């Protein structure tokens, strides 16, 4: 009676469970992957279960989401409020997976109302929480003093339970004169440190050596452990023990009992006494193996003292050391293979089931979900599950070791009202082990995700001048769907770059997502591309997503510096710069100006003097390019100085350019013109005739000018003498004031400004001489005849002519303002000075400026065919940007002894006589400073 009541209660419970689960219609299995670092605090976030299941957090408890697998699942839990998978306890990767490099914990997540099972795989990421350590506090090694160099001595292995890069990586030995450290690899990838003797030992000199062995891992930060090593030098022991086998191999079943002998090793030593007694010990034995095996140090017998488990450790490799009393040792390897034994029967776990089914349910209706497991491996762990063939049901394998029990045909309640289904699981061991369970079933009267990119945007970098077809970047989109719905193809949006279709620059592999360059990019053309990658799955209808990708072109040093000044002539000639012989050290001769089309460090330029005809005479500013005198010019210095200046950028590798400068050393134009013939003859013998013509022409002009001056002087003396006679004859007449203006009777012709423009081009076949052209804008103001002397007359003549003039008249008169020039006419940065400012002509710089202007003008004319200087006065034909940045230095005045007939003015440069104004006609024929016309 009691049994009937129990059966009735059981039936009612099964009926209620069938009604509760009667609405279950589908099943779907998939795997969810998460990762979490070890030693994470309890309650830490692992993954968003609700999001991955497509549920709201509040629906998890309502729909019966729970973890159903066994094992290490107590380490994780589902938070019903947040819908997250969290840690439920301390996670120690070394405890869970020990030496396994990849540590995964698998569990199953069941959605109760839909009978869906999800595989959850959590990867435990190792952190560097363990430092390498040695089991011994101190290691003592005994070495014979007659040990030959190259002898090896075993060192202890450090232990680091971490894996991967955080595990033990290397060893270091403290510096010493006798020993070195070498690592010997093992079959499992580990390395054993060995102490190698590098030199002969002498016990009488040093009986012991203290060393320090340090083990380091590869974590960040690096952890290390050290053990002191004391090397004791012993007396002679000339034989080492020898094992009978170099490798001992043995296989033992996993169910071997404790205390059973595994094998016995044997080593012999021909020495006598203590040197022939061999002691056995494990060398560099792992802590886990030391708990299972033990070695008799006297006999060499290896025994099992712990329990073997094939499922944990399948193979052991140990080194056994045989050492005699003299400290010599030898090693052998013992390989123990654990053989699996079918000692575990399969286990059947019903994760979910129904106890009632509609009779008209279509074939394939899910009745129950079950899991079968076997702790054995190999054939012993291969499990097959089956049910009796006469039942209208069948088992289908779903995921891993999970099965679902479904109907194979339509059930008829009128024929059978209930079924007792027996499930049997059998492994493939010998003998096979099996397990079974029962399911009672009563027959009652009666389905997304676009591809997702891991990042919201990407940035890729490619150096310019890349080869066509080079791989630039790779994008990957993940689709949580499966099969066709997870097949992702990639494409680019149809955009344009500078009016050119994007497809002409880059392309993408539709299957792999690899981006390729179709052209060689130029950083100077454009520096970045903005792309948008589209990922589309193969579902129906297809779903897609896109992501932005910024492609940045990196600059390379592909442009050499370009020299702007001095410009390279088209006829192969070189421009000439002027440096007066009176120039002091640091005098600015010229400036080399260069630019680089690259950017950043590739465009940083430095200047250096590569070659000079007179070493040590000139120096070049490293960062400015200014060419200055390094010392005072000497008479022995050649008139023509050749300089080779190199301009180099800071790219990798650096690129450079060179320019050759020719500097003429002279104090004045006549000196240059006098030596011009010799300069040209030295430069090129073929131009000697042309140089001769130039010298003859200049000499002729000088002679004509000298004759003209003599005539004017004679005329002036004659007029003066005539005026004295008139004064003597007309003594009773009222005196007329002396005119303060120079007459127009021929003296004005002398006051015309003559410009001798000479183009000197070194190493050229051409030279130019432009004859003087008058400038009628200059006027000299006459002074009283007794205010100053005429230096060109001898003292006696002066006394006769001047008569009773004041003896102070020999003082130097103030300069004529007509010899002043505007600031804009001075060499320097073009356009940087106010054109209205005036200043006295620099001492002894008139010839220098004229020669430089003429040199630059001729260089420009050689390049563009022009007969003018091209630039404004004082600019030397340079633009405001690239003009040489220098100021002419003052040198001793030589014009204070020059007298101009018919005028009381001298070519002196007395201070304090400036009127701050430019002469009335001083700039009549001059142009403003400006950039040279480009052709």
Curated annotation (Swiss-Prot):
The keyword Transmembrane helix applies. Its main location: membrane. Residues 925-935 have a biased composition (Basic residues). GO terms for cellular component: plasma membrane. The chain crosses the membrane at residues 694-714. Residues 715-935 are cytoplasmic. Residues 807-844 have a biased composition (Polar residues). Potential calcium-dependent cell-adhesion protein. May be involved in the establishment and maintenance of specific neuronal connections in the brain. This is Protocadherin gamma-A11. It comes from Pan troglodytes (Chimpanzee).
């Amino acid at each position: 009676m009691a049994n009937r009541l129990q059966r009735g209660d059981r039936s009612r419970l099964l009926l209620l469970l069938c009604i509760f689960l009667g609405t279950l219609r589908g099943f779907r299995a998939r795997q969810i992957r998460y990762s979490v670092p070890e030693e994470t605090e309890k309650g830490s976030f692992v993954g968003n279960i609700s999001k991955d299941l497509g549920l709201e957090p509040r629906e998890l408890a309502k729909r019966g989401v729970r973890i159903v697998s066994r094992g290490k699942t107590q380490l994780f839990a589902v938070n019903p409020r947040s819908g997250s998978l969290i840690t439920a306890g301390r996670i120690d990767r070394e405890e869970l997976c020990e030496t396994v490099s990849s540590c995964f914990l698998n569990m199953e997540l069941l959605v109760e109302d839909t009978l869906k099972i999800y595989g959850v795989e959590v990867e435990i990421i190792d952190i560097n929480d363990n430092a390498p350590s040695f089991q011994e506090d101190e290691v003592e090694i005994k070495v014979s003093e007659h040990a030959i160099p190259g002898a090896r001595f075993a060192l202890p292995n450090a232990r680091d339970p971490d894996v991967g890069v955080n595990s033990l990586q290397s060893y270091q030995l403290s510096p010493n004169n006798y020993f070195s450290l070498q690592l010997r690899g093992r079959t499992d990838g580990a390395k054993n440190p060995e102490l190698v003797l590098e030199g002969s030992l002498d016990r009488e000199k040093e009986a012991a050596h203290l060393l320090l062995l340090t083990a380091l891992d590869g974590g960040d930060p690096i952890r290390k452990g050290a053990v002191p090593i004391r090397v004791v030098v012993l007396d002679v022991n000339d034989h080492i023990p020898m094992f009978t086998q170099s490798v001992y191999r043995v296989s033992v079943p996993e169910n071997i009992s404790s205390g059973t002998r595994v094998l016995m090793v044997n080593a012999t030593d021909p020495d006598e006494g203590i040197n022939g007694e061999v002691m056995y010990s494990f060398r560099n034995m792992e802590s886990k193996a030391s708990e299972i095996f033990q070695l008799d140090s006297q006999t060499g017998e290896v025994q099992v003292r712990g329990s073997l488990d094939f499922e944990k450790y399948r193979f052991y490799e140990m080194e056994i050391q045989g050492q005699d009393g003299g400290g010599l040792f030898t090693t052998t390897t013992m390989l123990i293979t654990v053989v699996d034994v079918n000692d575990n029967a399969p286990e059947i776990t019903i994760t979910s089931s129904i106890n009632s089914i509609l009779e008209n349910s279509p074939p394939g209706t899910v009745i129950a979900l079950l899991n079968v497991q076997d702790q054995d491996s190999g054939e012993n762990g291969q499990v097959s599950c089956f049910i009796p063939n006469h039942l209208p049901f069948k088992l289908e394998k779903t995921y891993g070791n999970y099965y679902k029990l479904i109907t194979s045909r339509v059930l008829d309640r009128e024929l059978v009202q209930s079924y007792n289904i027996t499930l049997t699981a059998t492994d493939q061991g010998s003998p096979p082990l099996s397990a079974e369970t029962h399911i009672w079933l009563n027959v009652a009267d009666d389905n997304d995700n676009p591809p997702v990119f891991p990042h919201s945007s990407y940035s890729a970098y490619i150096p310019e001048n890349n080869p066509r077809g080079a791989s630039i970047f790779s994008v990957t989109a993940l689709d949580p769907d499966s099969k066709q719905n997870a097949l992702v193809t990639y494409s680019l949006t149809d955009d344009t770059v500078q009016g050119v279709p994007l497809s002409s620059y880059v392309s993408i592999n539709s299957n792999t997502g690899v981006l390729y360059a179709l052209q060689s990019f130029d950083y100077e053309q454009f520096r970045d591309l903005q792309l948008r990658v589209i990922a589309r799955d193969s579902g129906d209808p297809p779903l897609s997503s896109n992501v932005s990708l910024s492609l940045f072109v990196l600059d390379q040093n592909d442009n050499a510096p370009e020299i702007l000044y001095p410009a390279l002539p088209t006829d192969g000639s070189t421009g000439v710069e002027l440096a007066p012989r009176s120039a002091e050290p640091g005098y600015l001769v010229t400036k080399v100006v260069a630019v680089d089309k690259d950017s950043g460090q590739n465009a940083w330029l430095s200047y250096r003097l590569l070659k000079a005809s007179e070493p040590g005479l000139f120096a070049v500013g490293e960062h400015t390019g200014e060419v200055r005198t390094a010392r005072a010019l000497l008479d022995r210095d050649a008139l023509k100085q050749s300089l080779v200046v190199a301009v180099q950028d800071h790219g990798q590798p650096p690129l450079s350019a060179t320019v050759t400068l020719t500097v003429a050393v002279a104090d004045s134009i006549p000196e240059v013109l006098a030596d011009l013939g010799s300069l040209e003859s030295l430069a090129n013998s073929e131009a000697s005739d042309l140089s001769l013509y130039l010298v003859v022409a200049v000499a002729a002009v000088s002679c004509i000018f000298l004759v003209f001056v003599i005539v004017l002087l004679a005329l002036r003396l004659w007029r003066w003498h005539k005026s004295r006679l008139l004064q003597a004859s007309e003594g009773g007449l009222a005196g007329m004031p002396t005119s303060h203006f120079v007459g127009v009777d021929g003296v004005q012709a002398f006051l015309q400004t003559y410009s001798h423009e000479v183009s000197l081009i070194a190493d050229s076949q051409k030279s130019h001489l432009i004859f003087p052209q008058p400038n009628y804008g200059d006027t000299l103001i006459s002074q009283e005849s007794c205010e100053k002397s005429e230096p060109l007359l001898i003292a006696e003549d002066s006394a006769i002519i001047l008569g009773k003039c004041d003896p102070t008249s020999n003082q130097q008169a103030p300069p004529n303002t007509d010899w002043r020039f505007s600031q804009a006419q001075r060499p320097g940065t073009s356009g940087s000075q106010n054109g209205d400012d005036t200043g006295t002509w620099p001492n002894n710089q008139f010839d220098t400026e004229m020669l430089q202007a003429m040199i630059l003008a001729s260089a420009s004319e050689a390049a563009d065919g022009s007969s003018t200087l091209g630039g404004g006065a004082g600019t030397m034909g340079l633009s405001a940007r690239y003009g040489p940045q220098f100021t002419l230095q003052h040198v001793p005045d030589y014009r204070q002894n020059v007298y101009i007939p018919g005028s009381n003015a001298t070519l002196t440069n007395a201070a304090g006589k400036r009127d701050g104004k430019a002469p009335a006609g001083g700039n009549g024929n001059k142009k403003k400073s400006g950039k040279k016309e480009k052709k």
